[in-house]
Each structure stands twice: as C-alpha cells, then as structure tokens.
C-alpha cells in the first residue's frame, strides 16, 4: 500500500479536480460515437492523454475505429493495473427503427445541472472513463509512488453490434476489434478494472451470449385477393403468421430458460435473459404478396458454463414441437467468464471503497453480471478482471450520475491503484 501521505495528497488533488471531472465527462459525453463511428471520441481521449503526459497509442484495425492505450509508468517491481471503459454509445440519430425518440437529446448530449451530469453516453460509459482519467491525472500530478504501471484503455466496439446477413464489415464489427484486440496487441497488465455503472458493487462474473437467426418457411405466396381463409395460423402460407405463433412459444421457452440456467458465482449471480431483437419478413413497399419466409434474431445470454449448442437445440425443439419448417442458425457466440485469481484486486478495491464510500461493498445485482462487459476478454486471456463504478446502468433506464458519486469513484480508482501497484505481482 502507498504511504498515508501519498494517499492524502492524491485525495486532496482529486478534490481540486471536481470541475475538471465535470468538464471531461461533459465534453466526452457530448461527442456522438455510436458503435461504428467512435473515431472522434477516440481522438478526444488520445489528445487528452497526450496533453497530460500518458504517451497514448492508437491500437486498432481501422484508422477511424481504434482503441486508445496510455500508461502511467511505475518504477518497477509492482503489479500492473488496467482501467478500461468503452468509447461507443448505443444510439445514432437515425436509429428510428429501434427507438421512437431517437433524436432525444438525452441520447446525444451531456450536460451538468444541479450536481448531476446527464446523458446516456455519460452513464454508458464515458462518465466512468472520465473518472479514471481524472484519477490517473491526480496520481501523476501528486507524484504518487507506484511500482507497477497503470494502463489506461479506452476501447471501441463494446456494445453488442454484430455482423449478420448483408450487414458486414467496418460498421458492424464490435467486440472483435475492441478490448480483446487491444489486449492481444499489447494492452496487458496483471489485473484489470472495467469501469462501468454498478452502483459501487464489484462484480467479477459476466454472461456470454449466442445470437440465433431463426427463419420460418411457408408458402406459396398469393396475391391478397387469393388469401385462403379460414386457416390455422400454423398452416398459413404466410410466414409472418406462422412466425407469430413461434414467437409466442419462444417467449414461453425464454421464461423457463432463464429460471433453469440461473447460476450463483462468487462474483455475482448470472440470470441469462433472452430477447427477440429484430424481425424481417416481406417487403414494405410490395405488401400485395405476403412472404414465404420470415426471420427473427434472438439474443440469448449464457452463463459461463453453458454450451451454446445446447441452447440452439432447445430452440430447435420448440420449432419442431410446433411442426414448423424452419432453420435455426447461430451467427455469434461469445463465452462468459468468472475471474480467477481476482483476490488481490478485489481486496485492494474493498479497502479503497470502505475508505471513500464509508461502508463495505455489497453483492452486485444480477443485471450487472448478466450482460456483456469487457471483463470477459480480460478474463478469457488470463488477466483477472472485475467491473465497478458509480450509479445505475443506462440499460435499466438511468440517465445521469451524481458528480459527488463520480468523484468518489475516481478516489476509489486512485486508491486501488496505489495499493495494488505497490504489491508484488
């Protein structure tokens, strides 16, 4: 652990950086960066790190979609710690197929008002990023003694965008070019703290996922005046009508699936949820002939112990029970992980949390352990990782952070680094 004088000096330095924290979070959160278009946000972080002496590098597959990696160098002999958050956000202004209010400013802007910083992009995930950027700046400016390096990692492509059908290439890649790419190309450390919203509750297990495309076949297609009636929905020549019955059956299966596959782990509880995220059938400007095929796209979360093929076969069994002609095809699989050897980071974080927040940490909620977070690529590659940050998640509807909580998070991050990076690896 760093000396008490170092800790006090860093905490005092952070108290003086409150306005800088607000400015960084608002500026970064105001940059439009939907998945596929993170370049401007990456440039901001690169320039910020360069200006503050962290020697950043652009590490990425594409010139306009890259990860930013900076370092606060230690003197040697101590454990290294990565901080990680993502640059991309959930919403583009043209995303009207998913959101009725896609142009609402809450998705595209950030602002400070009465001790709160508003904006989806702040909550997910540029607010936590601002916290560890400011924490690193305070460590540097206060001259804190660190033996191990602090690795600052701002990544692209964390949000669940995946190539499928004609949607291929640059704009549709996500996790393959984000944290995992950065780690594989040099952003390595002994431990990693993924800064995201967890209500100050650390979690070190995350779900995996399998995405399935399920296509129902019917036919023959007929001109509207020749539509046969009456006919049972499962016998309809219209694939959309048949799909309606399958969706109903899959929703019933999904409820049962999450109950059967819920698992308790040391790092949290995984409750694997299922969502039907998209449907394609017919041509909107040629509706006079109903479609002979209709597809849905399923997002199925997996606990770390579940084989995706088992889940695929369960979905196929639902289809078979209805007597439908259909194809069930996986187009994405990513495994979930529970951290191994996390105790040194967990213990350092616990000490820092108690000092700053004033109480022991609590067990995380299941949503924080049942989604994708970039703890997974770290844990996959053997770098023990947990996620921890202030406030509730944007996926659950939260739209702001308290500045006081963000400052607390920055202090916890700084104290954790001062402890862990002065331990022997």
From Swiss-Prot:
GO MF terms, alphabetically ordered: hydrolase activity; metal ion binding
Temperature characteristics of this protein: Optimum temperature is degrees Celsius.
Active site, UniProt feature: 88, 158 (proton acceptor)
Pfam families, per the entry: M20_dimer, Peptidase_M20
pH dependence text: Optimum pH is 7.2.
InterPro entries: Peptidase_M20, Peptidase_M20_dimer, Peptidase_M20A
Swiss-Prot/TrEMBL cofactor(s): Co(2+); Mn(2+); Zn(2+); Fe(2+)
EC number: 3.5.99.8
Keywords: Hydrolase, Metal-binding
Catalytic activity from the UniProt record: 5-nitroanthranilate + H2O + H(+) = 5-nitrosalicylate + NH4(+)
Cofactor details (free text): Divalent metal cations. Co(2+), Mn(2+), Zn(2+), Fe(2+) or Ni(2+).
Family according to the record: Belongs to the peptidase M20A family.
Chain's role: Catalyzes the deamination of 5-nitroanthranilate (5NAA) to 5-nitrosalicylate (5NSA), the first step in biodegradation of 5-nitroanthranilate.
The protein's name: 5-nitroanthranilic acid aminohydrolase
The species this protein was found in: Bradyrhizobium sp
Upper lineage: Bacteria, Pseudomonadati, Pseudomonadota, Alphaproteobacteria, Hyphomicrobiales
